[in-house]
Amino acid sequence: MQVSLNPEWLARNNDEHKIRRNDHRSPFQRDRARILHSAAFRRLQAKTQVHGTSLNDFHRTRLTHSLEAAQIGTGIVAQIKLKQPEFRELLPSDSLIDSLCLAHDIGHPPYGHGGEIALNYMMRDHGGFEGNAQTFRIVTSLEPYTEHHGMNLSRRTLLGLLKYPALLSATRAAIPPPAVAHQRQLKAKDWSPAKGIYDCDLASLDWVLEPLCESDRELLGQMRAEPSSPKEHRKTRFKSLDCSIMELADDIAYGVHDLEDAIVLGMVTRAQWQEAAAAQLAECGDPWFEEHIAELSEMLFSGKHYVCKDAIGGIVNALLTSISVKPVEAPFHNELLAFNAYIEPHMGNALEVLKHFVSQYVIQIPQVQRFEYKGQQLIMDLFEALSADPERLLPQATGEKWRKAQEQDEGMRVICDYIAAMTDAYAQRLHQQLFSAQSHY
């Protein structure tokens, strides 16, 4: 397959002239370096992947999850190149897929989903909050690599980070839930955010999509079927090839590696696994799982780390090698949109079983949900205090940004950006400084 991609996909919003002696790196190698060396990426080491597991230092953080997703992402690309060499020129380089997987979580706030719910509620009248939208905002404007364009990444890299290529105003439910009388009464399920890009970042989104023809742009922003209720959010249908690979890598890292955490930390039992996962995997329709599930179950719960790790590696490999590139069922003209990576249906069923098991027996258990609830309350307390008297309580540099943003009535977004960037520990420390009588500065 002959591919001639528009050189505009290598462009940067700010045509920078860096002083770099003998720099022979590709644009995507430079992108990877910028992400890896960013403060936003470093902070992921102090944002826990699954809350309530941190009594043991074995647990994964957002940073280790991102590293694992990157390793899986490059593995997906390598095996597609072997299996479908005709797509070799179209597929992302290792540096590009690495960049996407390393950056995909940097917009996540402290305290995971609890923090996301809290910020979305507090920003309900100011454009909302969502982790993927925040990731896009960090790389395009907030991270101080350039004055106005964030990390100033290549256009194709930014396209690959657009999991939901539409504005939040287009995806948000037509009828929002009513505000609560007191934040302690806030139900998480009512304030789960819509997925998309902040309306205030429209200029950055427009720049990324500039090389696309009008029909491709229109199609890319298309929604899935209308929701059954005006209280439900709408969802976008399409994403780029690079993004589809990153998303599969993320799903596999979540479904399989978080399962490993849960087993080693004793959060799930053999009986729970047998009933809620092994039985379904044996019937998922894939011959590999049907043949090996009994042996895999033995290995996972053997009590020996190296045996469990071997089983985890086998599952990752089985999922990874069942992914291939196929045409998207839509008339896109641009090759980056006309093809996506898909997992074989039976293996897709198996991945859904694993993700559901992790959600049901790890994420949704009271031990984890109490941590998320606590974080949710803590973040809302911080937002309430900082927004009540920002000139008094914000750090000097953030206060300056707030004053400038207030001229366009965007001050709340600056406060939101400040809190979203915090690590779990920093948010907790600031909360103690503001609200605890025992706090010592």
UniProtKB/Swiss-Prot annotation:
GO terms for biological process: dGTP catabolic process. The keyword Hydrolase applies. Pfam families: HD_assoc. Residues 62-255 form the HD domain. One of its GO terms (molecular function) is dGTPase activity. Keywords: Hydrolase. PROSITE patterns: HD. PANTHER family: DEOXYGUANOSINETRIPHOSPHATE TRIPHOSPHOHYDROLASE-LIKE PROTEIN 2, DEOXYNUCLEOSIDE TRIPHOSPHATE TRIPHOSPHOHYDROLASE. HAMAP family: dGTPase_type2 (MF_01212). NCBIfam families: antiphage_dGTPase, dGTP_triPase, PRK05318.1. Belongs to the dGTPase family. Type 2 subfamily. This is Deoxyguanosinetriphosphate triphosphohydrolase-like protein. It comes from Vibrio cholerae serotype O1 (strain ATCC 39541 / Classical Ogawa 395 / O395). The gene is dgt.
